[in-house]
C-alpha cells in the first residue's frame, strides 16, 4: 500500500505593510519638497536663468528669438533667501560672450555683448578693424566683416573693467558709446540655445520684456507658437552650446 504524503507547505499570508501615521507622512513629504525647492533656488541662482534675445546687436551669432540658458556660476551667484552674493572669482576671456548689467544706464535692460578688451588693454578702432595692443584682432564672428566700424578711436581699459562690443557692429550700443563694463556688472555667460523662434516683429522693435528674467508671458507665448507654427522654429540652432 503506497501512502502519499502531502509535503506542500502553505505560505503564511503576507502581513500588510504598516502605513506611517498621517502626520509622519506629511512631515516626510514636506521635507522632500523643502529640498526640491532649495535645489531649484540654488540652480536658479547659479545657472537656470532663461533669457530671450530681443535685438539684432549680436547677429549672426545670436538671433532675435534665441532662447538661452545663462550660467551665473563664478560671476553673479546669489544665495537663496538672502541678499548676499558669492564673491566673484571667474574672469571672462577675450572674445567670450557675456551678459552684463547696463552700466551708466539706469533702468535699462541687461546687455549681451562680446568681450574685446581686457583690463590694461589698449583698444583701437580704425580703418574698419579692431586692434588690441597694436595687433589686429581676428574676428570671424562679425556679421559684416568688411563694413566700417564707427566711431574710430582709442581706449585704454582700466583695471577691473572690460571693453565690450556687439557682433553686429552697425547695430550695437556698446562700449564705443557708453564706456567700459566694470567687473561687478558681469552677470554671467550663455551656456546653450535651447529654443530659437523666428517670431515676426515690426521693424526696429525690440522685445526687452522677453530678455529680462521674471517676464514669463513672452516665453509661454513663444512655446505655444512653436506648437501651433512649428515652421517658425529654427531647428538647426537648438542645443547649440557656447
Regions found by a protein language model. Name each.
Residues 2-242:
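Extended hydrophobic leader/signal-anchor segments used for secretion and membrane insertion
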Amino acid at each position: 500500500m503506497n501512502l502519499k504524503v502531502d509535503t506542500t507547505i502553505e505560505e503564511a499570508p503576507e502581513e500588510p505593510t504598516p502605513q506611517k501615521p498621517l502626520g509622519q507622512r506629511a512631515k516626510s513629504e514636506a521635507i522632500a519638497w523643502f529640498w526640491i525647492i532649495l535645489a531649484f533656488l540654488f540652480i536658479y541662482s547659479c545657472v537656470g536663468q532663461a533669457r530671450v534675445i530681443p535685438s539684432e546687436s549680436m547677429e549672426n551669432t545670436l538671433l532675435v528669438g534665441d532662447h538661452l540658458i545663462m550660467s551665473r556660476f563664478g560671476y553673479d551667484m546669489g544665495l537663496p533667501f538672502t541678499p548676499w552674493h558669492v564673491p566673484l572669482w571667474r574672469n571672462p576671456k577675450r572674445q567670450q560672450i557675456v551678459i552684463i548689467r547696463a552700466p551708466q544706464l539706469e533702468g535699462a535692460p541687461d546687455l549681451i555683448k562680446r568681450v574685446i578688451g581686457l583690463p590694461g588693454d589698449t583698444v583701437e578702432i580704425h580703418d574698419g578693424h579692431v586692434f588690441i595692443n597694436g595687433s589686429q584682432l581676428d574676428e570671424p564672428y562679425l556679421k559684416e566683416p568688411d563694413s566700417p566700424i564707427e566711431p574710430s578711436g582709442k581706449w585704454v581699459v582700466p583695471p577691473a573693467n572690460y571693453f565690450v562690443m556687439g557682433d553686429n557692429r552697425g547695430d550695437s550700443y556698446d562700449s564705443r558709446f557708453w564706456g567700459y563694463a566694470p567687473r561687478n556688472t558681469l552677470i554671467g555667460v550663455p551656456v546653450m540655445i535651447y529654443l530659437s523662434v523666428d517670431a515676426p516683429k515690426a521693424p526696429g522693435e525690440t522685445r526687452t520684456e522677453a530678455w529680462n528674467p521674471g517676464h514669463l508671458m513672452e516665453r509661454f507665448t513663444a512655446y505655444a507658437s512653436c506648437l501651433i507654427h512649428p515652421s517658425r522654429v529654427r531647428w538647426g540652432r537648438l542645443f547649440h552650446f557656447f
